């Protein structure tokens, strides 16, 4: 007597770490192609760093009293050697680590870009996930406001390339370390006068990272934050000149911006310029790109003092905007779907499919789902569902006559406006299909 097999429990993904399914992947590919083209046009080079880094990298780089390090990192102890490791919550520190480790700056400044998944342990919601994807740039070795302006303008070009409207730029200056120290004294004194209004999070940050109190979303604290001493009033001559230089370049290039004195960013490595690109179309998660200047970071991670600036943008949030503004490109499907009946036709179908791929056409070859040969009718349904422009048909008659059937599957002028099957000599198939594809493309442009 055999035991009845127990039904296995269906496994699901980790909450906040989402699958990107085929029907969504086309939008991702569209964005990735667009952003990579933009990055190349500015002379940026791709760098790829590991997903896992030593925990100390982020503690030293991001700051021990930041939300990311205190509450959001996925950290673990390596069972093999006891090392403390972390799945990257952001990538600037890792890129800087790689640049130092591989002595990349020995021959001058570098323009680098990256793309990939990041990980933060937080409550999943629209636009905020535990695994999320970022694309970012790091301009290493550039000290002037012109570099700040260029990386900001890169974002504007990307919005234009994607067709996105209404993303607004906010900028601020965090000045230099001594200016922040003077402001910190005044800020703490101001906040101490309003202890009865501060929430627990603000009280916790008061003496460790008081700048972050200004970034509060608590309605009860808005007036206190609004009336707090502004860091911009503490800027010295050098910091003011840098900030004014940035503004001049942005104005000269017709990049509108707002100065937001409460813009501080959540990472400790920033100085001088900080900026965010924000939208009101994504609810609470309105920041789609953010960055600034982080001159102290390279030295902080063991390198020689080197100026640097960069930005990162959340890909999921940008894709949400593309959907919101109905800018999702249509899936064009493949070019050709090959259907066949009989052993001889199947063998020839493989040869034809490979020959067509050699010309650059995208080709799907019908394969059986159950090991049995499907009828022509069933295969044609699959061809229609694939989104292919043409079906190539091979059966006993076609093999005997040395021909191939070609049937348009979309509305097209390639066959006199008729979607009727034509028989084409096998040796002429490639030329026929290429001409038909050109005619179809011209039809679509009319």
From Swiss-Prot:
Q: Which Pfam families match?
A: HGTP_anticodon, tRNA-synt_His
Top enzyme category: ligase
Gene3D superfamilies hit by this protein? Anticodon-binding domain, Bira Bifunctional Protein, Domain 2
Molecular function (GO) terms for this protein are:
ATP binding; histidine-tRNA ligase activity
Asked if the record carries the keyword Acetylation, the reply is no
Give the GO biological process terms. histidyl-tRNA aminoacylation
UniProt KW keywords: Aminoacyl-tRNA synthetase, ATP-binding, Cytoplasm, Ligase, Nucleotide-binding, Protein biosynthesis
Localization per Swiss-Prot or TrEMBL:
Cytoplasm
Task: Name the catalysed reactions.
Answer: tRNA(His) + L-histidine + ATP = L-histidyl-tRNA(His) + AMP + diphosphate + H(+)
**Which InterPro entries does UniProt cross-reference here?**
aa-tRNA-synth_II, aa-tRNA-synth_II/BPL/LPL, Anticodon-bd, Anticodon-bd_dom_sf, His-tRNA-ligase, HisRS-like_core, HisRS/HisZ, HisRS_anticodon
Q: Which GO terms describe its cellular component?
A: cytoplasm
Task: Tell me its EC number(s), please.
Answer: 6.1.1.21
| SUPFAM superfamilies in the record | Class II aaRS ABD-related, Class II aaRS and biotin synthetases
The UniProt entry lists the main location of this chain as cytoplasm
Q: How does it assemble?
A: Homodimer.
What family classification does the UniProt entry report for this protein? Belongs to the class-II aminoacyl-tRNA synthetase family.
What this protein is called in its record is Histidine--tRNA ligase
The species this protein belongs to is: Paraburkholderia phytofirmans (strain DSM 17436 / LMG 22146 / PsJN) (Burkholderia phytofirmans)
What's the gene? hisS
């Amino acid at each position: 007597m055999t035991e009845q097999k127990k039904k296995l429990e269906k496994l699901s993904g980790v909450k906040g770490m989402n699958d990107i399914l085929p029907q969504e992947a086309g939008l991702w590919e569209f964005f990735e192609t667009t952003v990579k083209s933009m990055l190349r046009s500015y002379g940026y080079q791709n760098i790829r760093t590991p997903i896992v880094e030593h925990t100390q990298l982020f503690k030293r780089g991001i700051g021990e009293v930041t939300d990311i390090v205190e509450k959001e990192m996925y950290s673990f102890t390596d069972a093999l050697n006891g090392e403390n490791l972390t799945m990257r919550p952001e990538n600037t520190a890792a890129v800087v680590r790689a640049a130092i480790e591989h002595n990349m700056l020995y021959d001058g400044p570098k323009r680098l870009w990256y793309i990939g998944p990041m990980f933060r342990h937080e409550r999943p919601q629209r636009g905020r996930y535990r695994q999320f994807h970022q694309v970012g740039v790091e301009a290493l070795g550039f000290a002037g406001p012109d570099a700040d302006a260029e990386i900001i303008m890169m974002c504007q070009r990307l919005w234009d390339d994607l067709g996105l409207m209404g993303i607004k730029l906010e900028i601020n200056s965090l000045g230099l370390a001594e200016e922040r120290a003077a402001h910190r004294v005044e800020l703490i004194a101001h906040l101490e006068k309003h202890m009865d209004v501060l929430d627990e999070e603000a009280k916790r940050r008061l003496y460790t990272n008081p700048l972050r109190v200004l970034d509060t979303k608590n309605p009860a604290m808005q007036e206190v934050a609004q009336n707090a001493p502004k860091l911009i009033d503490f800027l010295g001559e050098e910091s003011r000149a840098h900030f004014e230089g940035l503004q001049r370049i942005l104005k000269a290039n017709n990049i509108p911006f707002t100065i937001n004195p409460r813009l501080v960013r959540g990472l400790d490595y920033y100085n001088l310029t900080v900026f965010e690109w924000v939208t009101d179309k994504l609810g609470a998660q309105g920041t789609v790109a953010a960055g600034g200047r982080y001159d102290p970071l390279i030295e902080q991670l063991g390198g020689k003092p080197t100026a640097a600036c960069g930005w990162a943008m959340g890909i999921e949030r940008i894709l949400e905007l593309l959907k919101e503004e109905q800018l999702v490109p249509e899936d064009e499907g493949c070019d050709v779907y090959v259907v066949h009946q009989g052993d001889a036709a199947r063998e020839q179908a493989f040869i034809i499919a490979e020959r067509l791929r050699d010309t650059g056409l995208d080709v799907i070859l019908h394969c059986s789902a159950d090991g049995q040969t499907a009828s022509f009718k069933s295969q044609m349904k699959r061809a229609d569902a694939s989104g292919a422009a043409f079906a190539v048909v091979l059966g006993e008659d076609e093999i005997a006559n040395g021909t191939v059937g070609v049937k348009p599957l979309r509305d097209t002028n390639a066959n006199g406006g008729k979607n009727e099957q034509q028989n084409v000599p096998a040796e002429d198939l490639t030329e026929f299909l290429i001409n038909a594809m050109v005619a179809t493309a011209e039809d679509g442009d009319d």
